[in-house]
Amino acid sequence: MPPLLKLALELGPLLVFFFANARGEMLIERFPILGSIGAPIFLATALFMAATVIALAISWSMTRTLAIMPLVSGIVVLVFGALTLWLHNDTFIKMKPTIVNTLFGGILLGGLFFGKSLLGYVFDSAFRLDAEGWRKLTLRWGLFFIFLAIVNEIVWRNFSTDTWVSFKVWGIMPITIVFTLLQMPLIQKHSLTDEENTAS
């Protein structure tokens, strides 16, 4: 899959979520039937769920596979989005990033506790590292996911819904990109050469 299309499929649902929340009242004025869903955050949640399903469907149709992280995240979006709409309580969709990041962080750190560097199983086809490299990278990503979960809790519990939505779309992605780039020295240091990879 082309990198730009992959990025669009990852960012698309988030942009739909941001736009629907920011322009929800305008959309409801233009399409009154949408008002039955509720306030802009609930309309945004419904469209976020739809966009997530569409993005996963496009990804599946092109690659005949779904990466584990987008799949898990998509399932949580649908579950917590449905709870948000059913109970008419936006707390559930706000907690979704906390649940997903805690889940990923817990799995990675739990794997290390049992001596397994689980990132190696996920990204081994993308790049090869020695055992120490996978251990360090797994530890860093595990702690980073926990950090994101804590930050999400702080933001949604202490700021307005609009601020939380903006942070979710325009804050988390740049932070994640910067963190990813900061891992490049570690990846380069522990990368295996073709000879080492063949020998291992």
Curated annotation (Swiss-Prot):
Its membrane topology: Multi-pass membrane protein
Record key words, sorted: Cell inner membrane, Cell membrane, Membrane, Transmembrane, Transmembrane helix
InterPro entries given in the database record: YciB (IPR006008)
Pfam families in UniProt: IspA (PF04279)
Location of this chain's protein in the cell: Cell inner membrane
Membrane-crossing residue ranges in chain numbering: 1-21, 37-57, 66-86, 103-123, 136-156, 167-187
Keyword hit for Transmembrane: yes
GO CC annotations on file: plasma membrane
Highest rank taxon of the organism: Bacteria
Role of this protein: Plays a role in cell envelope biogenesis, maintenance of cell envelope integrity and membrane homeostasis.
Family to which the UniProt record says this protein belongs: Belongs to the YciB family.
Protein name, UniProt field: Inner membrane-spanning protein YciB
